[in-house]
Amino acid sequence: QQIDDLIDLVVEVGHGSNFHILPCNGTEYIFYDDAGVRNEIVPDNMELNLGAEVFSELMAVLSNLQAEVAGDFWRQGLPLTGNFIQYRGSMINWCPIGRNAEGIQRTKFVEHDTETGFRKKHHKTLNEWVQWRKIPLTVALGGSTSFDIYPTGWDKTYCLTWFGDFTCWFVGDACHE
């Protein structure tokens, strides 16, 4: 699916036969040129960086938080769509309503978040846990519905480590922040 999406993007953007994209905070490199679509993984990996035990503990903390909020969301009529915690190699994305949520569902969550401060509260909770455990992680609000958790320094600009001499465009629904 990712390769098909890249081909569609190449056609839409109009860069012809030379297009490079760095999803996953720059730890994955997909490019399209005369030889076709190719994919390389940069040798950085969050699970290896943290260690299996700490990584598993983080996943357990997120799973417990998801279980807590799922009941509240269900009682309040908020959407739950599936694919709540996604490991992307360089980061974990936690989306309490689910990555599969579509427009109206996302809008409903954003309204709830604006009214209740849901993400601010859970951002604080996760940051307190990270500080208590003394783990070098950054917890950031990811777009309008999720949280991005990654090793400190591995934000979207991390790709500049590998491609600092190139023009890089950063995309996402909250890049203005």
Language-model segments: which ranges?
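Active-site phosphate-binding/coordination module
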Residues: 1-83
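Short, well-ordered alpha-helical microsegments
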Residues: 3-4, 156-157, 177
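Catalytic phosphate/metal-binding cores of nucleic-acid and nucleotide-processing enzymes, i.e., regions
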Residues: 11-15, 161, 168, 175-177
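Hydrophobic/aromatic beta-strand patches that form the interior of the parallel beta-sheet core
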Residues: 22, 169-171
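Short, glycine/serine-rich, charged loops/turns that create anion-binding
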Residues: 26, 98-101, 175
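Gly/Ser/Thr-rich beta-alpha loop segments that engage phosphate groups in nucleotides
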Residues: 28, 155, 174
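Conserved acidic, metal-coordinating active-site core of Asp-based
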Residues: 74-169
